[in-house]
Design a protein with these regions (language model features):
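Membrane-interfacial amphipathic/re-entrant helices at transmembrane-helix boundaries
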Residues: 1-23, 51, 63-66, 93-104, ...
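Inter-helical junctions in multi-pass inner-membrane proteins, predominant
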Residues: 2-12, 165-169, 196-235, 241, ...
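Single transmembrane alpha-helix segments in multi-pass membrane proteins
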Residues: 5-57, 86-98, 239-240
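Helix-loop-helix "hairpin" substructures at the membrane interface of multi-pass membrane proteins
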Residues: 16-17, 142-219, 243-249
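Pore- or pathway-lining transmembrane helices of multi-pass membrane proteins that form conduits
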Residues: 47, 54, 90-118, 224-236, ...
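Alpha-helical transmembrane segments within multi-pass membrane transporters and channels
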Residues: 60-110, 248-253, 257, 284-285
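Transmembrane helix-bundle core of multi-pass membrane transporters
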Residues: 89, 98-167, 194, 259, ...
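Cytosolic-side transmembrane-helix boundaries in multi-pass membrane proteins
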Residues: 94, 179, 186, 190-193, ...
Length: 296
């Protein structure tokens, strides 16, 4: 069992878990405030990855700079989608079940469009670039510069968003909307404005995650689907709409995947992830960190 004490595995688990947490943050913001199931979330990660790739390859712009542009582009796409499509859906005040069903279909269509456009523009070939790929030995653990930067930036963004939600006026408004939309409106929260902010911020975080992932992974037009699945598993584990719970669940999923594969085989990766997912749904459907709702 010496493998469990491996610093190399610990580092890999932290990087993967923090990445899952960051991706799931954006998905959780959109679902928590609006009950919309964004199955195109991973395709926004793909969009951010291609922005970083092309800017670095053709203009030698560092991904640490292009991540801001990727975030703005993805957030702008989110704002357009909200104003053009989802604002009217939300204004109709449909039931949560109907909203989820409608959003599932709409986002699925958006996902197909984004994947096909990316395939036409960038082709389906795998692409990659070398950035901060020097290997450093820290405490006996070998780590590349890009993965170390990725870990530090991902943790920083998660901490910054948590502080934003706890300390800023708009952050508190988002939390109020997550808890109860009607009550938030009664106390003066501009629901439509906060929904637009959450939608744009959720999309932007996915674009940001894509640029960080592109520094150490190959990218393709169809790279987003596994990240979408992982993000949904994370928000189920952490509790739907539970932002801190989602961060903890992302880290937990990263550890389960890395250590589970190390103890078994890479071929069991999907079995491990979906096994945990199904087990939580059966035993604790509100999530590991969610609160049980009592209906009276």
């Amino acid at each position: 069992m010496e493998i469990l004490a491996s610093g190399q595995l610990l580092f890999s688990a932290l990087v993967l878990g923090a990445t899952y947490a960051l991706i799931a943050l954006g998905l959780n913001l959109v679902y928590g405030t609006m009950r919309l199931l964004n199955v195109a979330h991973g395709d926004l990660v793909m969009l951010g990855a291609y922005v970083a790739y092309w800017l670095f390859t053709f203009m030698t712009v560092s991904p640490l700079l292009s991540m801001f542009l990727a975030m703005v582009i993805a957030a702008g796409l989110g704002a357009l989608a909200y104003v053009g499509i989802f604002r009217r859906q939300l204004a109709e005040r449909a039931t949560a079940g109907r909203l989820e069903a409608n959003s599932l279909l709409l986002f699925f269509g958006l996902s197909v469009i984004m994947q096909n456009v990316a395939s036409l523009v960038f082709t389906g070939s795998l692409r990659a670039y070398q950035y901060l790929d020097e290997v450093y030995i820290i405490g006996g653990v070998a780590m590349t510069g890009n993965r170390l930067v990725m870990l530090l930036l991902t943790i920083s963004v998660c901490v910054a968003l948590t502080l934003f939600l706890r300390l800023s006026i708009y952050g508190l408004a988002i939390k109020a909307l997550i808890q109860n939309r009607d009550a938030a409106a009664v106390v003066g929260v501009n629901v439509e404005r906060v929904q637009l902010l959450s939608f744009s911020l959720g999309f932007g975080l996915a674009g940001l995650a894509g640029t960080l992932i592109s520094m150490s992974k190959q990218i393709s037009p169809f790279m987003g689907f596994p990240f979408t699945i992982a993000a949904f598993i994370v928000i189920i584990l952490g509790g739907l709409g539970n932002i801190p719970g989602g961060i903890l669940a992302g880290l937990l999923l990263g550890f389960l995947e890395i250590y589970g594969v190390a103890l078994t085989s890479p071929m069991y990766r999907s079995v491990l992830l979906y096994g945990v997912f199904v087990g939580v749904l059966i035993l604790r459907p509100q999530g590991l960190f969610g609160l049980r709702r009592i209906v009276r």
